[in-house]
Amino acid sequence: MEPPRGPPANGAEPSRAVGTVKVYLPNKQRTVVTVRDGMSVYDSLDKALKVRGLNQDCCVVYRLIKGRKTVTAWDTAIAPLDGEELIVEVLEDVPLTMHNFVRKTFFSLAFCDFCLKFLFHGFRCQTCGYKFHQHCSSKVPTVCVDMSTNRRQFYHSVQDLSGGSRQHETPSNRPLNEPLTPQGPSSCTQHRDPEHFPFPAPANAPLQRIRSTSTPNVHMVSTTAPMDSGLVQLTAQSFNTDAAGNRGGGDGAPRGSPSPASVSSGRKSPHSKSPSEQRERKSLADDKKKVKNLGYRDSGYYWEVPPSEVQLLKRIGTGSFGTVFRGRWHGDVAVKVLKVAQPTAEQAQAFKNEMQVLRKTRHVNILLFMGFMTRPGFAIITQWCEGSSLYHHLHVADTRFDMVQLIDVARQTAQGMDYLHAKNIIHRDLKSNNIFLHEGLTVKIGDFGLATVKTRWSGAQPLEQPSGSVLWMAAEVIRMQDPNPYSFQSDVYAYGVVLYELMTGSLPYSHIGSRDQIIFMVGRGYLSPDLSKISSNCPKAMRRLLSDCLKFQREERPLFPQILATIELLQRSLPKIERSASEPSLHRTQADELPACLLSAARLVP
C-alpha cells in the first residue's frame, strides 16, 4: 500500500522527528531533511525538489552505502535511513537541468530572447544561454532544455511513421491548403488511421540533388509562386511621379498638358511681354525639359543593356526560373536568361520596376547587379563569381571546413540577408545553391528578389503557388493559406536550413525519399530537421540559434539583425591564437638575427 503523501489529517498527532538524512541533489546542490516517523522518501524530499523545479517522476534516488550507489524506491520509509546519505539524479532520458542565472551587462548588441527588444542590463543562463530582461523573467522556462536530446525521441517516431505509412492511401481527396495545426509526436503515433493522417504515396524516384556549380535546378517543377510586390510598386510609383513632374517642366504642369508654353500662355501676367521675350522664355523651358528628361534616362534607361553588346560563352546550369550563362560584357559576367515566355505588358512593367530596386543594391556579400535585358526575353546581368556554390562545397566536393570557418560563412550570409531586408527585398529562394564562396571564403548571395519571374501569371493576374526548393521552404509557404506567405521570417527559415547544412554537412530529411511526403509533413508541422545530427563541437549558442530559426510559427523566429548580433557575439567569444607582436616569425633561425657584417667577418677568419 502506498504511504500517505500529504499532511496529517485534522486531529492526528504530527510525526516525531527522530534524526536527519543528508541528500545530494542535481547540479551540485545538497540539503539535509528531517527524518520523521511514518513518512517516505517521496514525502521527505518533496519540498526540496519542488523549490528547485524538479519532481519525483523525472528523478531517481540512490542510497550511498560504503561509497556505492544503490537504487532505492520512492515509497521506502525514511525512518530506517536515519544518518545515511541519499543521492538524487535526473533520469538520463529526461533532458532537464536547472538554470544558472547570472546578472550581465551586454556591452555588445544583444536582444531579449522573449520580448525581442534591445537588451543592455539583464540576466543570462550560463547553461542554456537564455538572455532576458528582469521584467521578462516570468516567461523563462523553469528548466533548461537540450533541444538535440529533446527531439531525438520525436524523430524515432517520425521515422517509424515514414517507414510504415506506405500502405496508406494518398490524400487526393484532402486538399493541402485546408486549416493546418501542428500536432505533437504523441498525436502522430496515436492516429494511424488514413482518415486522420493520410500520407501521400511515395514517388518511385528519390529526391534528386542537382550538382551544378551555379544556380541548379530546384526540387519543384512548375511551382512558381506569387509575390506581393507592393514595396517594389510603391518605390516605382513614387519614382514615376517624380519623373512625370520633371517631364512637365518647372512650372508644375500636369502630365497631360501639351507643353509648358500653352500653360504659361493661359496665365495672366501683370506685365505684358514682347514676342522676343516670350520666345526666349519658351526656348529656356524647352532646354530645361530636355535636360531633365536626359537626367531621368540616366537613372534607369542606361541600366538596360542592348543584346548586341552581350556575348554568351558557356552554359553553366539550368534552374526552375532560368538558365545561367557565362558571358562577356566589359569583362566576365553571369547572364541569367529567365523563363518568361511571351511576357505581357504588366509583366514587363513589373520587371522593370523591380530592376529599379535591384540596381541600388551594393554590398560585399551580395552579387553585384550590373544590368538587365528585355529583348528578346528577360535577362539579368551580374558579376561573375569564380568560386563554387556552398551546395557544391558541402554535398559534392565534400570540402572540410573547421568550425571557425563555418561560423564565419554563417555570419556573412546573415550580414548579406540583413542588408537585403533593410532594402525591403525578400529573397524567396535562399538556399545553399544560391550562396557562393568567392575568392576564398567571401560569401556572395545571388538570385535574390525577382518577384515578377518567381510568380506564375494568368493574363494580368498572378497565380498563388509556392516557389523555391522543398527542403528550404517554410511551412506557411508550403500551405499558401495567406495571400502573401513570403516574409522576412520565411527567409529566416531558409537560412536555418542553410545553418543545418553547415553544422551537419548533410541535407535535411535524407531518410525520406518522397518529395510529396516531405511537403505534406513539413506543411502540417509533423517534420522538421533533426537537430541531433549537429556536430558535437558546435557551440551551444549556434545550436540554439538554429533551433529558433526553424520554429514552426513564423512569429517565433528571430529577424536577421538579432541573428547577426548573436553570431558576431559568438565569434568574439571563440578562443583565438594570435601571433606575438614582438616575434613576427616563429621559424627565424639564430643566424638570421646576426648582422650581415658579422657573418662576412666570420668567413674571413681562418
Curated annotation (Swiss-Prot):
Single GO cellular component term: cytosol
Basic and acidic residues: bias regions: 274-289
InterPro entries: C1-like_sf, DAG/PE-bd, Kinase-like_dom_sf, PE/DAG-bd, Prot_kinase_dom, Protein_kinase_ATP_BS, RBD_dom, Ser-Thr/Tyr_kinase_cat_dom
Residues found modified as Phosphothreonine: T181, T318
Residues the record marks as active site: D429 (proton acceptor)
PTMs per UniProt: Dephosphorylation by the SHOC2-MRAS-PP1c (SMP) complex consisting of SHOC2, GTP-bound M-Ras/MRAS and the catalytic subunit of protein phosphatase 1 (PPP1CA, PPP1CB or PPP1CC); this relieves inactivation and stimulates kinase activity.
Domain Protein kinase intervals: 310-570
Residue ranges of coiled coil: none
Keywords: ATP-binding, Kinase, Metal-binding, Nucleotide-binding, Phosphoprotein, Proto-oncogene, Serine/threonine-protein kinase, Transferase, Zinc, Zinc-finger
Chain residues that bind Zn(2+) 2: C112, C115, H133, C136
Chain positions covered by the region annotation Disordered: 158-207, 241-290
Cofactor(s) recorded in Swiss-Prot or TrEMBL: Zn(2+)
Every RBD domain range: 19-91
EC class: transferase
Pfam (any one): C1_1
Record note on quaternary structure: Interacts with TH1L/NELFD.
Protein name: Serine/threonine-protein kinase A-Raf
Organism: Sus scrofa (Pig)
